[in-house]
């Protein structure tokens, strides 16, 4: 039973990725097939301009947010922190996703240039117990000072987006390209769409080809590139997506482990029945005595069922204890 309990915990956790977002069923990542004369690239990014243009052209799109991952060196005073997991993100991040701020305004925290939101873990790392709001950190690569404008709860372990800090997208565009929202050639944005209630993602996808043709068809034809855009449900990214370099699970493994758990339970049930049958001969005398005192079939049946349930509960109790033991002890 301990093995089944551990398998159930594992499968449950693997299947729970990104389910903590209240709008998870309406969030989709935009993914791209980039076809050239020599190869086809299947990527988890789109051009920077795609999401804003979709929001403008289609009323079915309630909102969007884009992120771009980077490992940055962060300096606080004279102390350098290397390869910090950082994201540049649109200010709409906290509207699309349920990343909760404990300090700061979720609407404005990532709106201005040179602003940064830290997780509680990162805030303690850089500032201890001091209030981080208004404090300055330096992006050492470009020597850019960023101001802490918010502190968010640590990202849950069952999130495919994992990082400790989010820097305003306007900080990124300031250094790279102020006209990035109109750039149809730079595939650097991991973009998420929030669709309105009742919107069919398949129906929206059917409109993508003429949408891309109207905005950048000529440019892609001249470059001999075909750009195919599609939507990937947020709840399928971790277990089923083959795109991107984020942490991935495996839905097939979940099915295999679940089948193993069912097989173990079946074997345990068969063993329990065999043991009970073997003991029935030993208990025949007990049954006879109880009958002589007036015990009927229903009472005897209830007794045996209660005994079986009690044994199962005791086994489950010990399985939970065994499963909780730290193997490092």
Q: Which stretches of residues belong to each language-model region?
A:
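A short glycine-centered flexible hinge/capping loop motif at secondary-structure junctions
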Residues: 1, 292-296, 315, 319, ...
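Alpha-helical transmembrane segments
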Residues: 2-28, 326-329
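Short amphipathic beta-strand/extended segments in non-transmembrane regions
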Residues: 28-32, 47-102
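Intracellular coupling helices
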Residues: 268-311
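Small-residue-rich transmembrane alpha-helices
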Residues: 9, 230, 309-329
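N-terminal membrane-entry
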Residues: 246-264
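Mid-to-C-terminal secondary-structure elements
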Residues: 90-103, 116-252
């Amino acid at each position: 039973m301990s093995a089944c309990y551990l398998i159930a915990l594992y499968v449950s956790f693997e299947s729970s990725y990104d389910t903590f977002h209240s709008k998870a069923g309406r969030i989709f990542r935009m993914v791209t097939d980039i076809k050239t004369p020599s190869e086809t690239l299947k990527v988890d990014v789109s051009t920077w301009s795609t999401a804003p243009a979709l929001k403008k052209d289609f009323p079915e799109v309630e909102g969007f947010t884009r992120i771009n991952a980077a490992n940055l060196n962060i300096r606080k005073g004279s102390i350098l922190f290397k390869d910090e997991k950082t994201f540049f993100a649109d200010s709409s991040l906290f509207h699309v996703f349920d990343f909760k701020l404990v300090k700061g305004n979720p609407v404005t925290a990532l709106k201005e240039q040179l602003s940064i939101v830290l997780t509680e873990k990162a805030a303690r790392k850089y500032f201890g117990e001091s209030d981080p709001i208004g404090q300055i950190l330096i992006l050492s690569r470009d020597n850019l000072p960023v101001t802490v404008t918010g502190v968010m709860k640590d990202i849950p372990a069952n999130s495919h987006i994992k990082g400790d800090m989010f820097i305003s997208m306007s900080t990124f565009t300031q250094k790279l390209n102020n006209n990035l929202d109109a750039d149809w050639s730079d595939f650097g944005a991991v973009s998420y769409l929030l669709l309105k209630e009742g919107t069919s993602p398949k129906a929206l996808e059917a409109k993508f080809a003429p949408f891309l043709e109207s905005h950048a068809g000529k440019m892609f034809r001249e470059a001999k590139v075909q750009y195919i855009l599609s939507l990937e449900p947020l709840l399928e990214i971790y277990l089923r997506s083959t795109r991107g370099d984020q942490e991935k699970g495996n839905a097939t493994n979940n099915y295999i482990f679940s089948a193993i758990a069912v097989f173990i339970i079946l074997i345990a049930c068969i063993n329990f029945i065999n043991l009970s049958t073997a003991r029935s001969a030993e208990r025949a005398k007990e049954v006879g005595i109880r009958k002589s005192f007036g015990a009927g079939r229903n009472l005897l049946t209830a007794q045996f069922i209660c005994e079986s349930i009690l044994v199962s509960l005791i086994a489950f109790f010990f399985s939970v204890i065994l499963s909780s033991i730290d193997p490092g002890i």
